[in-house]
Amino acid sequence: MSDEGSRGSRLPLALPPASQGCSSGGGGGGGGGGSSSAGGSGNPRPPRNLQGLLQMAITAGSEEPDPPPEPMSEERRQWLQEAMSAAFRGQREEVEQMKSCLRVLSQPMPPTAGEAEQAADQQEREGALELLADLCENMDNAADFCQLSGMHLLVGRYLEAGAAGLRWRAAQLIGTCSQNVAAIQEQVLGLGALRKLLRLLDRDACDTVRVKALFAISCLVREQEAGLLQFLRLDGFSVLMRAMQQQVQKLKVKSAFLLQNLLVGHPEHRGTLCSMGMVQQLVALVRTEHSPFHEHVLGALCSLVTDFPQGVRECREPELGLEELLRHRCQLLQQHEEYQEELEFCEKLLQTCFSSPTDDSMDR
């Protein structure tokens, strides 16, 4: 059976009710929200993997607080055995699917194939990468994928593949596997993926490749100290600034958001950024036609001046004209509820950089 919503946490499952037959009309097992008296017909489907089994246990615990102690019924015991068996079987099946995908991806590229054959080969490889991305949203599968040397294949061959469709799917899969998993992040960093991803973000001709490369970079540096240190050594902040200056809206928004988050999480790098001229470049971006990404640019500026006198001094440089720009932007935003956070950043910058202790001219 197809399992809709199988990505991430699978099937919200609960144990079959204990023999007292009490029932909550909780959100719907497979079509019968009515009485639960008809034997085991209301039993939920067993989970397909260990993550689903864990979810089942959590759900059961939350739905039946402080159950009275009682012997486990034979029906309940049998159901649990079947659920555990199905979970392990489902995990094995998904590992086999990953192995099958890796066999496709490990094949050498057809050197002198005709156009139709090349297109079919690329389509098969793209399909394998997409299936892997779906499977690897489950952290157990992501770990198995890396143990099968899948990450070596992605970094070594597919980030630099000739077809853009292969490059962006490889970058997306790297990000999906790495997200919030320190051991996988360390493996990816050790393979030299960050340098290649920054190059894709900076130079690739395909916008989708650049957006997916940025996603993978974010997954490797936001909560990973070793990744951030590599990012600094590879001049990643300059690459990020150039991405914000592009005409691709999604790239601008995501780049500015990552910069803002890195500054909030790692204020110790503010001096480095100021010495790179980051204040001047961010102000220049705020002067461009108004866009949703300005919120994150102004948020980054706020992080550069909060409790940091060097950033305040640079914002006060008369040639920047930042005070006038901020006051004009406040007037523009006051009537727009959807820009409330951007307005607050403008007001904070005015207060921090341009208000003397006796100046209370911040009235809106």
Curated annotation (Swiss-Prot):
Positions annotated as ARM repeat: 137-179, 182-222, 225-264, 267-306
Post-translational modification Phosphoserine, affected residues: S356, S361
Gly residues: bias regions: 23-42
Cellular-component GO terms for this entry: endoplasmic reticulum
Keywords in alphabetical order: Phosphoprotein, Repeat
Region annotated Disordered, chain positions: 1-75
Ribosomal protein found in the keyword field: no
InterPro entries from the UniProt entry: ARM-like, ARM-type_fold, Hsp70_NEF-Inhibitors, Nucleotide_exch_fac_Fes1
Molecular function via GO: adenyl-nucleotide exchange factor activity
Functional summary from the UniProt entry: Inhibits HSPA1A chaperone activity by changing the conformation of the ATP-binding domain of HSPA1A and interfering with ATP binding. Interferes with ubiquitination mediated by STUB1 and inhibits chaperone-assisted degradation of target proteins.
Quaternary structure, from the entry: Interacts with the ATP-binding domain of HSPA1A. Detected in a ternary complex containing STUB1, HSPA1A and HSPBP1. Interacts with PGLYRP1; this interaction blocks the cytotoxic activity of the PGLYRP1-HSPA1A complex.
PANTHER family: HSP70-BINDING PROTEIN 1, PROTEIN FOLDING REGULATOR
Protein name per UniProt: Hsp70-binding protein 1
Origin organism lineage: Eukaryota, Metazoa, Chordata, Craniata, Vertebrata
